[in-house]
Amino acid sequence: MESLGIGFSNLVNSNRIIAIVSPETNPIKRIVQKAKEDNNLIDVTFGRKTRSVIIMDSSHVVLSCLQPETLQMRLDKSNNKED
């Protein structure tokens, strides 16, 4: 299992990530609201501002306080270690 650090010592399986997006757009806000209603929302911001939304292949939506660019760099670094 390849894991991605998403802040505050929390990890997700990087092989199951579909998208890492910014939370500001209305479609993403609707996805987050739907996940909350369906009990599929995982909030690991620890009260800080949500800066990225991670959509998983298991229909879970993960909120992180890290920028999408930061998560992308961590994911790229993790993928380069495999090579």
From Swiss-Prot:
Matching Pfam families: RemA-like (PF04025)
InterPro entries: RemA-like
Family membership noted in the UniProt record: Belongs to the RemA family.
Protein name per its UniProtKB record: Putative regulatory protein FMG_0656
Lineage: Bacteria, Bacillati, Bacillota, Tissierellia, Tissierellales
